């Protein structure tokens, strides 16, 4: 398999994080449905659609790296698998919508950080196509982070702090 540059490796990571986000939003949607939170389900469906589009755009861009697409997508699969492991550890049978959005807050913060690193690498390398992708994806990831953070706070506000956990 081809050796990857830091830029190519980071592209693989953000691709894998987008793939993992698709699974994470599906899991949190299941938790939101348990508590009949229709507003949350609509938010999660949009986030999931945007994660799918991000993964597709990343995969398409990876195809433009001569002889490197397979290696970039292998990096993506490894990152996706790590995300799936984190999801399985964090959300168990006792989890609720708040737990799900707390997880999404962490995951989205991580995605924002990865996209910002890719942005810096692309700028330094003057990689126009990567910079264009980052310009499209980073604002979406920042919005996802803010939505997850605010939704966590909203759900927490409806909890009785003195109830048993």
State the predicted function of each range.
Residues 1-165:
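Amphipathic alpha-helical hairpins
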